[in-house]
Amino acid sequence: MDIYDCILEKAKNANRAARTLSNMSTDIKNAALIKMAEELNKNKDDILKANMLDLEDAKSSGKNDAFIDRLTLNENRIESMASGLMKVASLPDPIGEVTRMWKKSNELNIGRVRVPLGTIGIIYEARPNVTVDAAALCVKSGNSVILKGGKEAINSNLAIYNAINKGAIEAGLPAGTIEFINMTERKAVEVLMKLNEYVDVLIPRGGSGLIKSVVENSTVPVIETGIGNCHVYVDSSADLTMAENIVINAKTQRPGVCNAMETLLVHEAVAEKLIPHLTETLSKMGVEIRGCLKTKRLIPDIRLATAEDYAQEFLDLILAVKVVSSLDEALDHIYKYGTKHSEAIITNDYTSSQRFLREVDAAAVYVNASTRFTDGEEFGFGAEIGISTQKLHARGPMGLNELTTIKYIVYGEGQIRE
């Protein structure tokens, strides 16, 4: 069977499963999620062996530390993925929820009800945890899912898929509920992006190249999960100890994720007090600093930042720094270089904070907190499928509700339209 026929068959299977899955009870879906968690833990050794193969290939091909971190699995991470499945099982089922009900003057009763999107394709890079997160959220929200992970994680993803799919089938979910594309050829993605008849939506999750390719080439509707060129702006009134703590957390806790800070903007009134000490601390933690001319005057040994640096999602221990003369200049910089993901201001000035909240166009905007909180778990949604930076159909962390659409139900007693 060639690539096209193989992907087409998987899409047909998933589409067929979606019809059955959309009408399955919450109890069956929850039982499946629990069984998937059990199988994940039961097959831990096989998954770790498969992950070692991927890690060896990644290291031999010179992948950076942030990439290796995203790819790495260990017992704790597998247990965390299993725990995530259990948490999703404990969340309220959005399917069938009546979000609004009203009666018209002609006695028609009209309701708006949550229903599944249908069949969802997830295209992602070297993030084995996405295999579990995506499957969990799709199952609970009554959607079938087609998973296409990056070739760098093919062994890990396949081992995870085999475990969770076994659990799903044994618990009574229809075959095809979770499909996995184990082909690494580029054509596999190209085929998936054109299967409008069987796939309702595609969600790409990864770097800018992947997302751009899917958005530009897919005929299937796309929910764009975001590139995270996130900024922290330290205002003239900021508590500098708080600013240091937030900046260090936002940059170094997990530099390889989309809600990590990539650019630090500092008001010139506090630049001399903040930048030398903060950048010394960051440098000791392995962060490379690239700054504007004003920053370089304060710390001469750094590399001069370019426009490309300010536009870059580094996903690494690299930080671009710029000294600005005002909140206006900070807002202009974010408007020019931001990716509508997560932006933060550190300030003790109420007027500045409210202006920042109003004027910054992003999925999540923070006052005196780290950008690292843009996450489904941290927002209380449970697991997430990704962070949407577009405005249709969803924005921000995408949990269960964001994987549904609406259906109008209308009760009548023989009414006809005049």
Curated annotation (Swiss-Prot):
TM regions (residue ranges): none
InterPro entries: Ald_DH/histidinol_DH (IPR016161), Ald_DH_C (IPR016163), Ald_DH_N (IPR016162), Aldehyde_DH_dom (IPR015590), G-glutamylP_reductase_CS (IPR020593), Glu-5-SA_DH (IPR012134), GPR_dom (IPR000965)
Reactions mediated catalytically: L-glutamate 5-semialdehyde + phosphate + NADP(+) = L-glutamyl 5-phosphate + NADPH + H(+)
Enzyme Commission identifier(s): 1.2.1.41
Keywords: Amino-acid biosynthesis, Cytoplasm, NADP, Oxidoreductase, Proline biosynthesis
Function of the molecule: Catalyzes the NADPH-dependent reduction of L-glutamate 5-phosphate into L-glutamate 5-semialdehyde and phosphate. The product spontaneously undergoes cyclization to form 1-pyrroline-5-carboxylate.
Similarity comment: Belongs to the gamma-glutamyl phosphate reductase family.
Protein name: Gamma-glutamyl phosphate reductase
Organism of provenance: Clostridium kluyveri (strain ATCC 8527 / DSM 555 / NBRC 12016 / NCIMB 10680 / K1)
Name of the gene this protein is made from: proA
